[in-house]
């Protein structure tokens, strides 16, 4: 996507890197002051059976490993939440083509974008809702970031805030000890 700032058009580029740090501790996460750092625990089990971030514009969350298969858009979708993007309110987008990145699971789409193209639209027991692998980042997603309102220094702007929440492995805590996340999938 592109954005226009002070009558100049720029190509939007997100540089995303990752590292595996199984021994990272809560204090290191809580004390983070680098806006480039995001913290996501990735585990086999998640209470609620879904990946999530801790809130809009945050920098931490919890991913269910099953959601991160090759071709999955879950990480990009959750990253959108960390940048402050909401789920759209109209969740029946039949006739509107390819779903944008921020549409959640359960969105009603044209058959070719469903888990099961033969299922009745909206039948979430038989695959009649959007398969997340079909979501794409679209120019309108970039516009929703309102990048033209950021303060830029040396060509860089900061999008999002710090939540810096350390998450325990959900397999080690009961569902009553689990704090319900603010933003789902």
Please annotate each region the language model reported.
Residues 61-70, 89-185:
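Metalloprotease/metallohydrolase-associated module, dominated by Zn2+-dependent proteases
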Residues 1-95:
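Metzincin-family zinc-dependent endopeptidase catalytic domain
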């Amino acid at each position: 996507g592109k954005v226009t700032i002070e009558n100049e058009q720029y190509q939007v580029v997100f540089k995303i890197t990752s590292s595996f740090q199984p021994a990272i501790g809560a204090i290191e996460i809580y004390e983070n002051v680098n806006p480039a750092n995001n913290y996501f625990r990735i585990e086999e089990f998640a209470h609620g059976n879904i990946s999530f971030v801790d809130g809009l514009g945050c920098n931490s969350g919890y991913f269910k490993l099953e959601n991160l298969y090759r071709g999955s858009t879950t990480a990009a979708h959750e990253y959108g939440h960390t940048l402050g993007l909401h789920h759209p309110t109209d969740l029946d987008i039949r006739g509107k083509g390819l779903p944008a990145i921020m549409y959640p699971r359960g969105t009603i789409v044209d058959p070719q974008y469903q888990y099961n193209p033969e299922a009745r639209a909206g039948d979430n027991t038989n695959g009649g809702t959007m398969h997340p692998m079909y979501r794409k980042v679209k120019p309108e997603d970039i516009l929703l970031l309102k990048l033209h309102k950021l303060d830029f220094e040396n060509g860089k702007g900061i999008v999002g805030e710090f939540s810096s929440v350390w998450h325990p492995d959900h397999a080690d805590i009961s569902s009553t000890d689990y704090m319900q996340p603010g933003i789902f999938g």
